[in-house]
A protein has these predicted regions:
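N-terminal, positively charged/glycine-rich alpha-helical extensions of SAM-dependent methyltransferases
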Residues: 1-25
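Conserved Class I S-adenosyl-L-methionine
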Residues: 34, 66, 202-295
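A generic alpha-to-beta junction signature in SAM-dependent methyltransferases
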Residues: 50-51, 75, 86, 161, ...
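Class I SAM-dependent methyltransferase SAM/SAH-binding core
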Residues: 55-128
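A short SAM/SAH-binding and catalytic strip from SAM-dependent methyltransferases
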Residues: 136-150
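Conserved catalytic/acceptor-binding region of the Class I
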Residues: 151, 158, 164-235
């Protein structure tokens, strides 16, 4: 999932959980398309053709079920992974620390007829509800960098995977959205301490995800890292401005702001946009996909 928080990681987890509890209903609408494109790219590195109704996949830090939707429902037009959705449907279990996200997952399950899926409120670094060697794959899309102890999370993935199973994690490499949000924030409140969508800088590197997976028990020779470009497609300049005015991004930023300051937001967002972004309605985003196999 995306993240807005402060620089101290222990406080950021509390902030993040509260933020997504409050804004869970808007997450899929405002961030879902980009997250879906990245998740589809990540899933393309799994042996999808080998999965069947007897397979079991863990959607960890599942949010509203973006990974699960790709596995079980017809793909959106901008996703072209031939093996998606998987048929026959595998069993998919979704977990998320945010209760509202799990409720959203369950609502999607009901409306989209995910008869082979279920979801639970569960910390992704504590998979004690699951047995050893239970899953054929574990997928954590944009979640590993939010854990208190990412290595413990990786070790739990390793434990619950069957021998020969795959764990896939994703993290960002570049985030144009962050530059725009930060630029607008700094223009209005130059002395603010807030860092929208803050991530520890090391998580933007290619080396960090693979080092965490290796420390969690995966053999170095069984870890590969790939790059993806799941750009944020808003359709137009107005689409970008509208998207970056969503409470998903602004509810934390606007805390304590005056009406005058809030009124400046859209204008400052426009000032941050490059000419090509205004013409295309596209913001560049790139990401790392780390794939680890349990030997």
């Amino acid at each position: 999932m995306f993240l807005i928080n402060v620089t101290h990681h222990s406080l950021s987890q509390i902030s993040e959980k509260f933020h997504f509890q409050k804004n869970a209903s808007s997450y899929e609408e405002d961030a879902g398309a980009t997250s879906t494109r990245l998740a589809a790219a990540a899933l393309s590195y799994l042996p999808l053709r080998s999965y069947s109704s007897s397979s079991h996949i863990l959607d960890s830090a599942a949010g509203p079920g973006i990974v699960t939707k790709l596995l079980l429902s017809p793909s959106p037009a901008d996703v072209s992974v031939p093996e998606l959705p998987v048929s026959p449907r595998p069993r998919v279990t979704g977990i998320d620390l945010v209760p509202a996200m799990v409720e959203h997952f369950k609502a999607n399950k009901a409306s989209l007829n995910w008869t082979t899926a279920d979801a639970y409120v569960q910390d992704s670094e504590d998979l004690s509800r699951f047995k050893d060697a239970e899953f054929d794959a574990v997928v954590m899309n944009l979640g590993i960098f939010n854990l208190r102890d990412p290595v413990a999370g990786a070790a739990e993935m390793y434990r619950v995977l069957k021998p020969g199973g795959y764990a896939v994690i994703t993290t960002w490499k570049t985030r144009r959205v962050v530059e725009i949000l930060q630029g607008a924030l700094d223009a209005i409140r130059p002395n603010s301490w807030l860092k929208p969508m803050y991530m520890p800088p090391e998580w933007l590197t290619k080396e960090k995800p693979s080092s965490v997976m290796e420390a969690g028990g995966f053999h170095k020779d069984q870890i590969e890292t790939f790059e993806a470009e799941p750009n944020w497609e808003c359709g137009s300049e107005e689409g970008i401005v509208k998207a970056l005015n969503s409470p998903l991004w602004t509810s934390k930023i606007f805390e304590g702001w005056s009406h005058e300051e809030i009124g400046r937001w859209n204008g400052e967002i426009r000032k941050q946009l490059r000419d090509t972004e205004k013409k295309t309605g596209t913001l560049e985003m790139s990401a790392w996909i780390c794939v680890a196999r349990k030997g």
